[in-house]
C-alpha cells in the first residue's frame, strides 16, 4: 500500500523508530485472537509448584507435546492457554475453528492411555514431565474425554495412511485426551537453534 504523502511516511517511520528505541524490537502484527498469552511461571510460582511435584500425579509427554508446551509458554499458540477441551477439539476437527469461531486448523491436544487416566481427576493438577522424566509444566485438569483417532486423521490430515508421520503419531498415542490450562515451569532443554527462537 502506498502512503499518501511524505508526511504520513515520516510519521510511520518515526513510530517504528520510537518503538525500537523503547523496546529494542520491531512492532509486530497483533496476536491471533487479539491477546498475547504467556503461560510461563514467574520464578516464585515455579518454586512453589516444584515443591508440590512429588505429591502430584504425572504424565510423560511425547516430543510433539513438549514442543506444544513451548508454544503455549511463549504465546506462539495465543489465544490458547492450554490443551484443548472437548468442545474446542471437536470444533477444530470438524470446522478448523475453536468453539468461539476463531480460526484454528490443528488440534493442540494432550493424549493419555487408559492406565494413565486411572489416577487422574478433573479439578486436580497433573505434572507434565519431559521424556527424560523432568517436570516441565503443570496441567490444571479440566476435562478427560474420549476421541476418535481415525476420524481426526481423516479430517486433519485427509488420510489414515500411517506412512504420513502425523497420522502415525496420532494413531500411536493414547485413547484419551486431557484438557486444561497449563502453567509452564521451564522451557524445554536441548532445543535446537536457540539463538533463532525469538518469542512473541
Model-derived regions: residue spans:
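Non-catalytic terminal extensions that flank enzyme cores
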Residues: 1-200
Amino acid at each position: 500500500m502506498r502512503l499518501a504523502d511524505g508526511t504520513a511516511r515520516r510519521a510511520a517511520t518515526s513510530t517504528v523508530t520510537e518503538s525500537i528505541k523503547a523496546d529494542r524490537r520491531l512492532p509486530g502484527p497483533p496476536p491471533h485472537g487479539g491477546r498475547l498469552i504467556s503461560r510461563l511461571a514467574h520464578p516464585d510460582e515455579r518454586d512453589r509448584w516444584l515443591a508440590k511435584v512429588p505429591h502430584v500425579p504425572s504424565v510423560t509427554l511425547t516430543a510433539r507435546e513438549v514442543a506444544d508446551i513451548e508454544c503455549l509458554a511463549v504465546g506462539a499458540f495465543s489465544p490458547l492457554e492450554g490443551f484443548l477441551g472437548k468442545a474446542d477439539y471437536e470444533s477444530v476437527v470438524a470446522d478448523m475453528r475453536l468453539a468461539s469461531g476463531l480460526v484454528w486448523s490443528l488440534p493442540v491436544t494432550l493424549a493419555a492411555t487408559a492406565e494413565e487416566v486411572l489416577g487422574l481427576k478433573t479439578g486436580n493438577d497433573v505434572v507434565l514431565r519431559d521424556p527424560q522424566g523432568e517436570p516441565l509444566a503443570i496441567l490444571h485438569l479440566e476435562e478427560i474425554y474420549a476421541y476418535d483417532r481415525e476420524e481426526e486423521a481423516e479430517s486433519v490430515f485427509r488420510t489414515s495412511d500411517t506412512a504420513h508421520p502425523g497420522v502415525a503419531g496420532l494413531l500411536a498415542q493414547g485413547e484419551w485426551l486431557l484438557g486444561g490450562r497449563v502453567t509452564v515451569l521451564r522451557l524445554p532443554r536441548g532445543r535446537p537453534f536457540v539463538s533463532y527462537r525469538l518469542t512473541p
